[in-house]
A protein has these predicted regions:
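Glycine-rich phosphate-binding loops of nucleotide-dependent enzymes
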Residues: 1-263
Length: 263
């Protein structure tokens, strides 16, 4: 079943086409890689899907029939499409647990039924319980009382994903989740992404680390100059001449076949 469909979406800034007639069909339960050279339109695509930007033209459908292009980002998030950002948005003066609890509170505020279904105290207890579960799930349990500002970069990125999970995503948009990480941090995050996916969450991932993309993703869409260049399985993308040409001068992805990410 298609959980997300992007149909003929374009986004212009002045006379510049950041996205040009992009069509994507994301199947429920997949991990989809969105790759391309710098300036290809990857983050703009995420911004359009998540409601940060309205598309200039085209349509986006969620769960088959619900059209979401043009909806407010808070509305889209409340429907279960949650994104992370290249620069993790944290409350740096809050603890790890408090960051996740606040995200739970904000999510519950969008759920009117939840507000009326129980007392405020009960909701607070449920939010705290769920926040603790998420913190443990993301491997941050021993750091739950640590200030976010004191965390190493890799743990801050993990906390960013934990905050996203607090909003109960059905579709999770990960914008460069591995950027700036050491090899050890990267391996840890890759394992966490797999764990998140095993919870039944569909994942779209923008990432420049091609080895990790080839290892993690079931299917890959390649953007170049705002257009969808090609789609395919990882092995197909590795050997596609158009993709290799687009990446010349950055990284030769044809050399990545068969390599595994260290765990």
């Amino acid at each position: 079943m298609a959980i997300l469909e992007v149909k003929g979406v374009s986004k212009y800034f002045g006379g510049l086409a950041a996205l040009d007639n992009v069509n994507l069909t994301i199947q429920e339960g997949e991990i989809r890689g969105i790759i391309g050279p710098n300036g290809a339109g990857k983050t703009t695509l995420f911004n359009v899907i998540s409601g940060v930007y309205r598309p200039t033209s085209g349509q986006i459908f969620y769960m088959g029939e619900t059209r979401i292009d043009g909806l407010a980002s808070s509305k889209i998030a409340g429907m279960g499409i949650i994104r992370t950002f290249q620069r993790t948005a944290l409350y740096h003066d809050f603890t790890v647990l408090r960051n996740v609890t606040v995200a739970r509170h904000l999510h519950a505020r969008e759920n009117i039924f939840g507000v009326f279904a129980g007392t405020v105290k009960k909701l607070e207890e449920e939010n705290l319980k769920r926040a603790l579960e998420i913190v443990e799930f993301m491997g941050l349990g021993r750091l739950k009382n640590e200030l976010a500002s004191n965390l190493p970069h890799g743990h801050q990125r993990a906390l960013g994903v934990a905050i996203a999970l607090a909003c109960e995503p059905k579709v999770l948009l990960l914008d460069e989740p591995l950027t700036g990480m050491t090899p050890t941090e990267k391996s840890r995050m890759i394992d966490l992404i797999r764990k998140v996916h095993q919870q039944g969450i569909t994942i779209l991932m923008v990432e420049h680390d091609m080895r990790s993309v080839m290892e993690l993703c079931h299917y890959i869409s390649v953007l170049d100059f705002g257009r969808l260049l090609v789609e395919g399985l990882p092995v197909e993308i590795q050997n596609n001449e158009a993709v290799i040409s687009a990446y010349l001068g950055t990284e030769d992805i044809s050399s990545l076949g068969g390599e595994k990410v260290a765990t």
